[in-house]
Design a protein with these regions (language model features):
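Bacterial N-terminal signal peptides
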Residues: 6-16
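Acidic, Gly/Ser/Thr-rich repeat motifs that build Ca2+-stabilized beta-propeller blades
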Residues: 21-174, 227-230, 235-243, 293-331, ...
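Beta-propeller fold detector
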Residues: 28-30, 70-79, 130-142, 198-207, ...
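Beta-propeller domain segments
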Residues: 54, 88-90, 98, 169-337, ...
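Short, glycine-anchored, charge-dense loop/turn motifs used at functional sites
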Residues: 161, 414-421, 453
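Conserved blade-ending motifs and adjacent loop-strand segments that build the rim/top face
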Residues: 334-354
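Glycine-centered coil/turn sites that cap beta-strands in beta-rich domains
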Residues: 378-414, 423-427, 435-438, 458-459, ...
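C-terminal tail/sorting-segment detector
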Residues: 428-431, 435-437, 443-473
Length: 473
């Protein structure tokens, strides 16, 4: 994959000729090298201008938040405690609001024997803030599991100082509606004031009480609430819930409310027939989008940074399968509007730093940043057109590239995790049409599985077009 600027140009009829709306995704740390399945980017907000990168296999690295950084330090390795089978792994990382003084941070991960989701606290070394103490683990809460998917796993502190934890329904849909079960919920706990023999307390303002009910629950009715975030200026909690058959959801979370699964998927009954929602206190999603090749929302953040004025106040999120990164605009009153920004396959997570700048973790191993500006585009110099057909295809598909000027061309196929699986062209190429067939095989000649892939056209070190294709065998 190119480690340079990735560009998607979105035409604007309001701009003069030669000017286009451009959204740039670029490698935030081009001299650093790649990570292995980065699952999170977190700023400890301790005044040190550092970022912590969590890898799914259980390692956390610390780096300087500087585009010129060339090295990383291993902060913590708990890979021996973790299973990465199916959707398992190190899933969440959060720093205590008073981390600068107490050095506490929290992780969530999937473990076996017995199978469970674990929320645990660790401490950084007081004499070396770039190294954690592996022996400092304090298990806060463990959630029994039957399956290894629909885990959720995001943890984050709210402005109220409480810790929130999103949990999927473990592939057992009915658990999401059962308040005596943890699964399919957003929890809210007090880690500063333990009580009741636990390593945490329950805030007095939590909404649920009663025999057998888990008082830790803040909201419920989720399928797989993989990522959520807080928007401090508004106090809203934004949550992306991964759908089943038809719809991906963006929800605004309210105290004690039911978000519908499995009675509803998106704004429709599930399955699509009549359903009785009487007395269920259901809140419909703020926004939904149909699958049509999309299949797994990655919830993001409302952008509040200084670098992209055109994105301020917009909710930035992605679809893991299509790679589409989008901006949702909502003023709290009118229906939301959505705009595609760019494409980057295999995005599991977003992060923000102390300035509100947005980072994008990709399973290609890179950490990206996003820029959206009005930029003069010299289209005749490197303009290219990418055509693919048939799409979907069975045994082979035809790929054509048209260049209006000579360019260094890298035309490659990527899977949904962002891994390059086939190189179709990689050469200095003359102006004109260049054509190639792809037979659905990787670079070693093995036939790939049916599914969604991406053909990416790089010219002169810039990604100028990415097209989704579907192989059906």
């Amino acid at each position: 994959m190119s480690r340079n600027l990735a560009i998607v140009l979105i035409a604007s009829t309001l701009m003069a000729p030669g000017i286009a709306r451009a959204t740039y995704i670029f490698d935030a740390f081009p001299k650093l090298g790649t990570f292995s399945n980065p699952i999170g980017v977190e700023d400890p907000m301790d005044g040190t201008d550092r970022l912590f990168i969590a890898e799914r296999a259980g390692r956390i690295y610390v780096i300087r938040n500087d585009a010129t950084v060339t090295s990383r330090t291993l902060f913590l390795d708990i890979s021996a405690l973790i299973t990465t089978q199916t959707e398992g792994g190190l899933l969440g990382l959060a720093f205590h609001p008073n981390y600068e003084n107490n050095r506490f941070f929290y992780v969530t991960y999937t473990a076996e024997n017995p199978r469970r989701e674990v929320l645990a606290r660790y401490s950084a070394d007081p004499s070396n803030p770039s190294v954690a103490l592996p022996g400092s683990q304090l298990v806060i809460l463990e959630i029994p599991k039957i399956n290894l998917h629909h885990n959720g796993g995001r943890i984050a502190f709210g402005a109220d100082g409480y810790l929130y934890w999103s949990l999927g329904e473990d592939g057992i849909a009915e658990l999401a509606q059962d308040l005596t079960q943890w699964n399919g919920k957003l929890l809210r706990i007090d880690i500063n004031n333990p009580s009741g023999g636990n390593n945490y307390g329950i805030p007095a303002t939590n909404p649920f009480a009663g025999s057998g009910v888990h008082r830790e629950i803040w909201a419920y009715g989720f399928r797989n609430p993989w990522r959520f975030s807080f928007d401090p200026p508004t106090g809203r909690i934004w949550l992306g819930d991964v759908g089943e058959n038809s719809w991906e959801e963006i929800n605004i979370i309210r105290k004690g409310r039911n978000y519908g699964w499995p009675r509803m998927e998106g704004k429709e009954c599930f399955p699509p027939s009549t359903c009785d929602t009487t007395g269920l206190n259901i809140v419909l999603p703020l926004y939904v989008y149909e699958h049509f090749g999309s299949a797994s929302i990655t919830g993001g953040f409302v952008y509040r940074g200084p670098s992209n004025p055109s994105l301020v106040g917009k909710y930035i999120y992605a679809d893991y399968v299509t790679g589409e990164v989008s901006a949702l605009t909502w003023n709290g009153v009118n229906p939301p509007t959505n705009a595609l920004l760019t494409v980057e396959p295999g995005i599991p997570s977003f992060g923000v730093d102390k300035n509100g700048e947005l980072f994008i973790a990709s399973f290609d191993g890179n950490i990206y940043r996003l820029f959206a500006t009005a930029t003069a585009v010299d289209t005749p110099a490197i303009a290219g057109a990418l055509k693919i057909g048939p799409n979907p295809f069975g045994t082979s598909t035809h790929v054509a590239v048209s260049l209006t000027a000579p360019a260094r061309v890298d035309l490659s196929v990527y899977d949904v995790a962002g891994r390059r699986v086939a190189t179709l062209m990689n050469a200095q190429s003359a102006a004109g049409s260049h054509e190639v067939n792809w037979n659905g095989r990787d670079e070693s000649g093995r036939t790939l599985a049916s599914g969604v892939y991406f053909v990416r056209l790089n010219m002169n070190g810039q990604t100028v077009e990415t097209r989704r294709i579907t192989m059906i065998k």
